[in-house]
């Protein structure tokens, strides 16, 4: 506190800083509320995605067992070698209240994975089931990645709000009180000093007035 110079200029600056800090708290709280709403929306989406993934996994492996049983493991393995690989997974960045949140996007090959001509029915259905499984897996990865990132942003924003409310703003207010107290004390001292000076001046003037001869008495004496 002793490092703060108690001047009126610093008092004005600290008041401006206080207003900015309070405005910052309001904006950060709005951001946090928006992120929390987004977070809970993603929680529901993530639960649905997980449920869909479990179902897709069951269907895919059931279709695989049927294909191996009816078409033969060698046919299924040979067909799997002809399936084009996933072209890639990209992470697009979205701006959510100033926070960069990734969105995963997978690019699957166009058209059917296997040609219906010459591919046994059960093997063909297994390839379709595993594509649905891959799509469900990407959806889960996307929602859970976004969920994790938004959760981190909520924690970061909460820490910033707490720092402003519990450290920065109280510190600025304490500095304002200190400067005000010093300025008020100086004002009282200046007022007291001025009163003393004024009193001395008035006393000196009274003494000088009392020591002067009365003009009317001098005129009467001359007559």
Curated annotation (Swiss-Prot):
GO terms for biological process: proton motive force-driven plasma membrane ATP synthesis. The keyword Nucleus does not apply. It comes from the Bacteria. Belongs to the V-ATPase D subunit family. This is V-type ATP synthase subunit D. GO terms for molecular function: ATP binding; proton-transporting ATP synthase activity, rotational mechanism; proton-transporting ATPase activity, rotational mechanism. InterPro entries: V_ATPase_D. Keywords: ATP synthesis, Hydrogen ion transport, Ion transport, Transport. The lineage of its organism: Bacteria, Thermotogati, Deinococcota, Deinococci, Thermales. Produces ATP from ADP in the presence of a proton gradient across the membrane. Residues 203-223 are annotated as: Disordered. Disulfide bonds: none annotated.
